[in-house]
Amino acid sequence: MLQGRIAVLDVGKTLAKLTIWSADGRLEDRHVRPNARAVSDDGYPCLDVAGIDAWLAETLRAVTEKGQLSAIVPVGHGAAACIVDGDTLRLAPLDYEAELPAETRAAYLAQRDSFARTGSPALPAGLNLGAQLHWLEAIAPQKARSGVILTWPQFWAWRLCGVVAAEITSLGCHTDLWLPVEGCPSPMAVARGWAGRLAPLRRAADGLGPVTEEWQKRGGLRENCMVLCGLHDSNAALLAARGHAETRGRDCTVLSTGTWFVAMHSAAARTKLDLSSFPEARDCLVNVDVHGNPVPSARFMGGREAEMLEQAAAAPIDPKACEAALLDLARRMVERGVMALPAFQKGVGPFPESEGRWTDRPADQMARRAVAGLYLALMADTSLALIGSTDSLVIEGRFADDPVFTRALASLRPRQNIYLSHAHDSVPYGALRLIDPDLPPHAALLRTSPLPFDLSFYTAQWRSRTLTTDTIV
């Protein structure tokens, strides 16, 4: 059992969330803030550190009026780093969607280690953390070339307790800075001096220290409120999936669905990976779990593409509320051969160079949403095949409520046990398992069933029309 009330701070790209959990693992409260665009004092687009910081203090103050917290666990995405010195933030993290100048990017690409060493593909904009550090040194060399480099969850841990730490799930997610098989910094990180500026390596579950006096005053926290080191958000979802009986002790893949669809294949036992066997050009990568094990992964921007395909005139369709209509429309779209072909978000995913197009774009929004569900399933199936996903598959996140997507994926992968997590709190549940590994899940997994109509001919046609020379396994 957890000891006292716990807060999980999940700082994503789009939203910052603070959830409060009771000692028996029940959700007590949830607070959400949309993140704003920001510009740093040095003139580059950055993440909204100041806005999140102010919101966090105000929210913690409201939370602690109802009862004190015993611990805070920070979670964050894997494409942000801050440079700090003592108790000062020297440089805020770049916005990873900002495009590097062409010359700056070319100079960085020439220095990267191979994918076969790092498991990090060359990603666009600032999605490789090394590219951000390289660009920061060009923008503000005096500030960027000294100080401690902190990844995003560990920045918030430092902000709350004043202790710097590095952690492997954040260092090992497409950063270019880490070797997932060897478990050490990359040669480029060493050569550029970045490895020597990383904070001491700590485990995600380590308590770094109690909150500072500043946060005792601003957030109303007690002096014994402990701050954990924290972890990468997708790894928290993986840790959550491992808390279910259906996945324990067996191969398991978690498909987290939101703006990004991230598939992470966790083997039952550690095996030696040949990183060169994964196609770098198709957005495959190798993450690292909380135990230091390499985790083959693949991604595409499914949530973003679904929005582009649906093109909602007003409110987007709620797939859970419209299940029967969407399934019927999906059947009709399959019979007519109406398809969305990849990729509508160029530069990422299994078809990064292909130009997205409709074979016959429906005028009706509901029909477009049905085809979007089929498209997401075909894209997910492709990514899952690329990383060798087998046995149990857990779909979590908002698209676990999309019946066309989930049932189409079950049709495409009949040899896998496909489960849905409708908890909508997989990330905080995974974070809580750092404190109590035996904490039972607060919602059972649901087994999904295939579509009630045949998808094989439609699938074959979609695959034959995709604009790639790669083989779909």
Residue spans of the language-model regions?
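A short acidic/small-residue loop/turn micro-motif
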Residues: 33-37, 97-99, 199
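Glycine-rich phosphate-binding loop of ATP-grasp-fold ATP-dependent ligases
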Residues: 91, 170-177
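Active-site core segments that coordinate phosphate-bearing ligands/cofactors
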Residues: 8, 17, 109-122, 131-146, ...
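Short beta-strand to alpha-helix junction loop
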Residues: 181, 204-208
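N-terminal glycine/serine-rich phosphate-binding loop of ATP-dependent small-molecule kinases
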Residues: 1-93, 145, 216-229, 391, ...
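Nucleotide/phosphate-binding loop and acidic/charged catalytic motifs
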Residues: 72, 166-172
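Active-site phosphate-binding/coordination module
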Residues: 64-130
